[in-house]
């Protein structure tokens, strides 16, 4: 068997295994909750969906985009919102900001579901970024997502067995699959975190995303508001 044929077979097997991994994760999710509503991030994505789907980087071409449902939560994945981290300050599209402000919401909800990934590892428990809910009455509430508890590196290490999952009870693996590049066969991993709104009776006007300026670079792909407890039916934590 020639080298080129062997290479082609290995590539096809890699795609098959990636698709299988995607199916296993996605099959855990039942129908989306009808009261959950994706947040429109269209004007906030510095990396738009066209880059994710039409670029040359295999990782971006093999990750899920558009309408997706993970763990009962409907998501609209239209790009990536990166925040600054010490691992790398810029990419080849734009600078990573320390803060992304005034994401319009204008509704009441019990929980905010954040679909995210990250580059560069930090020690477990390291704060990575904050999600600030700004209410119509001028008050605010802040949640902090930390490495290990909520956030994991988006590249799955080749020797990572079993698959590492977030250890916080309000965070889950949402999707695993794809492939980092033609030469690096690492699968990709994204997490989903449920942030309970301490004041569900108040209208949330906007949301801010703020970097904690540690080594890890977080990125948010989608957010959805809805009832609390959508992740509660999933498998127990390891």
What residues fall within each predicted segment?
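N-terminal secretory signal peptides that target proteins for export/translocation
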Residues: 1-11
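Serine residues within intrinsically disordered or low-complexity segments
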Residues: 4, 18, 27-29
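N-terminal/edge-of-domain interface segments
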Residues: 30-238
């Amino acid at each position: 068997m020639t080298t080129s044929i062997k290479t082609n077979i290995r590539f096809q097997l890699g795609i098959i295994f990636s698709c299988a991994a995607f199916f296993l994760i996605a099959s855990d999710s039942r129908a989306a909750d009808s009261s959950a509503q994706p947040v429109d991030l269209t004007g906030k994505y510095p990396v738009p969906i066209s880059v994710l789907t039409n670029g040359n980087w295999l990782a971006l071409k093999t990750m899920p985009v558009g309408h997706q449902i993970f763990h009962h939560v409907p998501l609209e994945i239209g790009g990536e919102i990166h925040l600054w981290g010490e691992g790398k300050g810029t990419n080849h599209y734009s600078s990573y900001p320390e803060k992304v402000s005034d994401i319009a919401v204008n509704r009441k909800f019990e929980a905010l579901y954040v679909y995210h990934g990250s580059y560069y590892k930090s020690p477990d428990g390291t704060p990575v970024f904050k999600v600030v809910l700004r209410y119509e009455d001028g008050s605010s509430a802040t949640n902090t997502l930390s490495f290990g508890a909520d956030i994991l590196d988006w590249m799955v290490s080749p020797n990572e067995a079993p698959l590492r999952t977030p250890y916080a009870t309000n965070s889950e693996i949402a999707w695993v699959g794809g492939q980092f590049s033609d030469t690096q066969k690492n699968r990709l991993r994204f997490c989903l975190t449920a942030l309970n709104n301490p004041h569900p009776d108040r209208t949330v006007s906007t949301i801010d995303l703020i970097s904690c300026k540690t080594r890890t670079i977080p990125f948010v792909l989608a957010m959805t508001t809805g009832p609390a407890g959508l992740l509660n039916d999933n498998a127990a934590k390891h």
